């Protein structure tokens, strides 16, 4: 057990899907897993373990922002032996060609956070996803005829940013989605020698003002979850 996870040793599978919202973790476990059992509930950050098509998989919320997700990712890796983490969450779009409900596979993640520089002795670390996990997710999407875009996310420290001009810079550099965690998870995974990936569904469009309801964010995004789960099965074959 840790200060943030009250699960016994062996409670988590080697692969964990991590949404930010603990209620989305509950929804994923109850909707997609067989024989799902809650294994942790500290601070109402729920974690579950069950099976998907016979494959043992866990679901664990990670909260909002790089500090929160870094704590949970680190403890899952070092205390519970997790080898692969897939963030499944929401993001905002800035580009006109990225629409509401589009799915983004984050091959890399930029950030304005200082956290990764602290880890990497004040140098920039290229926060990238594992290639095989990225490829597996892309292959699943193509097999299921689900439209996805692959490229850079931007992990922001501020949800309500005063620097709106930065959105123009993001668009210029081809950022597909703005969220708050991927860059942190990628670097925690790199630090401890495990694999990670972030798959996000566009819940807001920063330019147009379109957005999904809180209920939609919690209970939908099924295609993203299917891509993540099926990609685990493909990964087992490589």
Curated annotation (Swiss-Prot):
Residues that, per the record, bind phosphate: 20, 24, 43, 87-90
UniProt site (Important for catalytic activity): 217
Catalyzed reactions: a purine D-ribonucleoside + phosphate = a purine nucleobase + alpha-D-ribose 1-phosphate; a purine 2'-deoxy-D-ribonucleoside + phosphate = a purine nucleobase + 2-deoxy-alpha-D-ribose 1-phosphate
InterPro entries for this protein: DeoD-type, Nucleoside_phosphorylase_CS, Nucleoside_phosphorylase_d, Nucleoside_phosphorylase_sf
Cellular component per GO, a single term: cytosol
GO biological process, one term: purine nucleoside catabolic process
Known role: Catalyzes the reversible phosphorolytic breakdown of the N-glycosidic bond in the beta-(deoxy)ribonucleoside molecules, with the formation of the corresponding free purine bases and pentose-1-phosphate.
Family, similarity comment: Belongs to the PNP/UDP phosphorylase family.
Quaternary context: Homohexamer; trimer of homodimers.
Protein name: Purine nucleoside phosphorylase DeoD-type
